[in-house]
Design a protein with these regions (language model features):
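Cytosolic regulatory regions of ion transport systems
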Residues: 1-150
């Protein structure tokens, strides 16, 4: 949410977040966001949140944090509730990417690939003797963020 707040806060009005973490729920609610308290693996929660009429659905929780479900199952549920929505899913393993597409995802992000891209830039900075500059750049970015979970 912090990235959206920084880049295009007007989008926040169009977003509904589903979360069962009370800290996340309270923090986002206090910021004026539309938050539904519930488990994303529960079909009733998805219906209550309006998944059936959403244009874009982002499943950002990796399988390792999901209880009783996985992203493939969630994509199938969401796709059955909303055949026309654009669905973005998260994969931790490259071997999961094709399964998520087959389940109905329109786009699959593999977070460790973006992490690897960032880490490579850190390695380049270290090799160029610019690691302190890279850290200062990152510290400045962190200072302007308002993350939901610290």
């Amino acid at each position: 949410m912090s990235e959206i707040e920084l880049r295009n806060p007007s989008i926040l009005e169009q977003i509904t977040v589903i979360d069962f973490n009370p800290v996340v729920f309270r923090t986002l609610s206090d910021r004026g966001m539309h938050v539904v308290y519930g488990d994303i693996s529960n079909v009733d929660t998805l219906l209550h949140a309006g998944v059936g009429k959403s244009e874009l659905i982002i499943l950002s929780i990796p399988n390792s944090l999901l209880k009783g479900a996985d992203n493939e199952k969630l994509v199938r549920h969401v796709r059955s509730l909303n055949p026309t929505a654009r669905i973005v899913a998260t994969a931790e393993l490259l071997s999961d990417v094709d399964d998520l597409y087959e389940a109905g995802a329109d786009y699959v992000t593999v977070t460790r690939l973006s992490d690897a891209h960032h880490l490579f830039k850190v390695i380049e900075a270290a090799q160029a003797g610019l690691l302190e500059d890279k850290r200062a750049e990152t510290d400045a970015l962190l200072a302007e963020r308002r993350e939901v979970l610290p």
